[in-house]
C-alpha cells in the first residue's frame, strides 16, 4: 500500500510489479536492484529511457509518474511525483510533485502544497524505476538475435553483466529501444544525402527526416546544394526563398516530432 507521511508518498513496489506483469518487455523489480541515479540523471533516465505504460492502462492513485510541471512551447519543465487522484472524465490528475522539482512551480497554491493538477496527456508512468531493469530489457533484446535458447541465455548474461556494472553504456536510442518490442532505431544520429535542389527533392528529404525522427534518430542535413535566396525559379517564374529558409523548415520538425518522454528530434 502507498505510504502517506505528511506530504510525502513512497513507491509501492508490490503494486508496480503486479502492473509490470501486463508488459512482457519489462522485468520486475527485485531486492538486489539499487541503481536509480540522482538529480537530473535520474529524471533523464526515467523520462527518456525507461519503458512506460503509454496507454495508462495501469495508472491509478499512488503511482509514481513523470510529468510536465511547467508548460513551455520549447523547454517544458519535467519532474517526478505521485498521483493523488484521477478524474477520468476530465482527464485530469492531481499530482504531488517531488520536493526536488517544486522550484519551477509558480502558482502560490501549488508552491505551498506541492500538489498540481495536470492533464493526463502530460503524465507518464514509468515501469522501470531501476537501471537494472533497463539493463535486463536491453540484454534481452540484444541477445534475441541468437538462434537457440541456450545461446540467448548465454548472451543475455554477458550483455547484462557489462551493462549493470556500467562497463559499457549504450547510446540513448539503444537504452530506449532494445528489448522494448517497438520499431525504433538503435542509431542516435544520421547524416543525410545532399538535398536535391527542387521542390520534389526537398519534399522527399523532409519526408525521410520526419520518418527518422519519429523512430528516435537525430538528423544531419547539408543545405549547400540548395540555391540562394531570390534565385530565379524558372519553371514557375518565381524566386527561391533560399537554403536558410528550407533548413529552418526542417529544423522546426524537431518541435513536432516527439521521441519518447520529452525528447525531441535533433537537426545538425
Feature annotation, model-predicted:
Residues 1-268:
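Extended catalytic cores of very large enzyme megasubunits
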